[in-house]
């Protein structure tokens, strides 16, 4: 079983702001009623654990290639090659993606 404490970095689907809040609560990264506070705290402390490259809103949303771009970011993070946005001491990363209108989702866990 995977626990929140096992995930060091995550790329979650955030093409719309509400998607990030829904994803982190449904993935168990935070409690359902705490996702807004969690994201606010990440921002205020400059913690890049969630969407270290700025998410889909900040880095772009390449239709048809979103999942692979998120996967590349997590793999690059785990390899220690993310330069300025590198998070230290990573062992486990998570990639979450959704299709149009949330009709399907995928979740992948990568380990170093």
Model-identified regions with their sequence ranges:
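Extracellular interaction modules
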Residues: 1
């Amino acid at each position: 079983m995977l626990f929140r404490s096992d995930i060091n970095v995550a790329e979650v689907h955030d093409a719309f702001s509400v998607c990030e809040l829904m994803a982190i609560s449904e993935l168990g990264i935070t409690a359902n009623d705490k996702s807004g506070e969690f994201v606010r705290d990440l921002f205020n402390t400059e913690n890049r654990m969630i969407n270290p490259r700025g998410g889909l809103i900040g880095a772009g949303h390449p239709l048809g290639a979103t999942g692979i771009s998120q996967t590349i970011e997590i793999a690059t993070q785990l390899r220690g090659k993310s330069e300025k946005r590198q998070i230290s001491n990573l062992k486990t990363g998570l990639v979450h993606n959704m299709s149009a209108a949330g009709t399907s989702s995928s979740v992948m866990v990568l380990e170093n």
